[in-house]
Amino acid sequence: MKKQYLKSGSGTRKEKDKAKRWFLDNGSIFLRELVADCNGKSIPIRSFSPEQILKATNNFDSSCFVSQDVYYKWYRGEIEDRSYMIKRFSEDEITGKRHRVKEVYNDIVLSARMSNHSNFLQLLGCCLEFPFPVLVFEFAEHGAMNQRGGVIVNGEESLLPWSVRLKIGKEIANAVTYLHTAFPKIIIHRDVKPMHVFLDKNWTAKLSDLSFSISLPEGKSRIEAEWVLGTFGYIDPLYHKTCFVTEYTDVYSFGICLLVIITGKPAIMTISDGDLQGILSLVRELCENGKLDEVIDPRLMKDITSGQRLQVEACVVLALRCCKERDEDRPKMIQVAKELKQIEASLKNSS
C-alpha cells in the first residue's frame, strides 16, 4: 500500500507533529555531520518544504519515477517552474533507518562540498521533514546511465557515439580525481559505476551518490572499513579481501566502469549454463587473442574511424592497467584523467 505523507493544508495535528519530529531529528544529525566535516565553512543548502516535494513528485507517483538503486529512488519534479532530480531514500524494514543514517548524511554533506565541480550532480537543497531527508539535485536531461553504459530515451536505449563515450569517461575520471586530490583528506567514492553517472543536455557527466564515500586519515594511504560496500562486479578484489580502502579502490572500479562504457556490456554477464563472467576477464581474454574488434561495442563498428579505433585501443589498455591485481601496479586517478585527456586530444591533433 502506498504511504501517504502530509499534504499541503490538510495534515492532522498528529501528522504535523510527526513531520516536526523528523525535522528535529534529521536536522540535529545533519548539523552535527556538517560541522564535523566542514571545519566551520559555510555550505549553502536550500530548505524545501514537504508540500513542495510532494507536489513536485505527485506524492512520489510512478509517473515521476526516473531510476533507482538498492537504497533509493530518483524522481523528476518541478518546483517554482524549474525541473529537479529528487532523491528519496528507502524506508522499508529490510534496509532499516538506523543502518542508513550515516550513508544518507554522507551523501548530503559530501555532495554539498562537490557542488562547485562541473562533473558532480549539484545538490541544491533537501527536505528534513520525512523519515529520511529527501534530497533535491540539479536536473539532468538525459538521466542516469544504465548497467550497459548507455541511456534510455523514450523507452529505448540510445546509442552513444564513441566521442561522447570518451568524453563521459574523461569527465568521470575528472570527478574521481577531484575527490582524491582537492581536500586535505583523500575521499574515496567506493561505488564508481555508470548507474551513478547522470548526463545533462550537453552530455556532460555528473557523478552522484557519495553515500558510501569514506575519507582517509590525513597523511595516511588507507583505512580499514567496517563493511565492504559497493556493487558486485565493480568492487576491487583487494578491498573485498582485506577490507582496506585506498585510492586504488576507486581506480579499479573506474577501470571496470570504463570497460562497460567501451563495450556496451554490463560488468557481470550470464553466459552458458547460467555461469557468470565479469567484463574484465572477457576483455582480457579477447585482447590476449588479438580480438580488439570484439571488445568494442558492435553497434559502433560501422561508424568508427581508424583514428577512433586507436583511441578505443588506448582506453582498453588504460582500463586494464586500472584493474591490475596489485594496487601498486595501478595508476593514480590523476594520471588516468591526464591520459584520457591526451587520448581525446590525439584525434584533434592528428586532423
UniProtKB/Swiss-Prot annotation:
Q: What is its EC number?
A: 2.7.11.1
Example GO biological process: positive regulation of defense response to bacterium
* Catalytic activity line of the entry: L-seryl-[protein] + ATP = O-phospho-L-seryl-[protein] + ADP + H(+); L-threonyl-[protein] + ATP = O-phospho-L-threonyl-[protein] + ADP + H(+)
The record ties this protein, via SUPFAM superfamilies, to: Protein kinase-like (PK-like) (SSF56112)
Q: Deletion: any effect?
A: Increased sensitivity to the pathogenic biotrophic bacteria Xanthomonas campestris pv. campestris (Xcc).
Q: What is the effect of changing residue 240 to E?
A: Abolished interaction with uridylylated PBL2 and abolished ability to mediate cell death as well as an increased sensitivity to the pathogenic biotrophic bacteria Xanthomonas campestris pv. campestris (Xcc)
Q: What is the effect of changing residue 233 to A?
A: Reduced interaction with uridylylated PBL2 and reduced ability to mediate cell death
The active site consists of: 191
Expression across tissues: Expressed at high levels in germinating seeds and at lower levels in adult leaves.
Induction details: Induced by elevated temperature (e.g. at 25 degrees Celsius).
Binding annotation for ATP: 66-74, 87
**Protein kinase domain mapped to chain residues:** 60-347
Q: Which UniProt keywords apply?
A: ATP-binding, Kinase, Nucleotide-binding, Plant defense, Transferase
Provide a Gene Ontology MF annotation, just one. Answer: ATP binding
One Pfam match: Pkinase
**Function recorded in the entry:** Serine/threonine-protein kinase that confers a broad-spectrum quantitative disease resistance (QDR) to the pathogenic biotrophic bacteria Xanthomonas campestris (e.g. pv. campestris (Xcc), pv. raphani, pv. armoriaceae and pv. incanae) by restricting bacterial spread to the vascular system from the infection site; X.campestris causes black rot disease in crops. Seems to not have any kinase activity.
Q: How does it assemble?
A: Component of a stable high-order oligomeric complex made of RKS1 and RPP13L4/ZAR1 which recruits Xanthomonas campestris effector XopAC/AvrAC-mediated uridylylated PBL2 in the presence of ATP to form a wheel-like pentameric resistosome; this complex triggers immunity toward X.campestris in vascular tissues. Interacts with RPP13L4/ZAR1 and uridylylated PBL2.
Q: What PANTHER family is this protein classified in?
A: SERINE_THREONINE-PROTEIN KINASE ZRK1, WALL-ASSOCIATED RECEPTOR KINASE-LIKE 21
The entry assigns this protein to a family as follows: Belongs to the protein kinase superfamily. Ser/Thr protein kinase family. ZRK subfamily.
What protein does this entry describe?
Serine/threonine-protein kinase ZRK1
Per the UniProt record, the lineage of the source organism begins with:
Eukaryota, Viridiplantae, Streptophyta, Embryophyta, Tracheophyta
Q: Which gene encodes it?
A: ZRK1
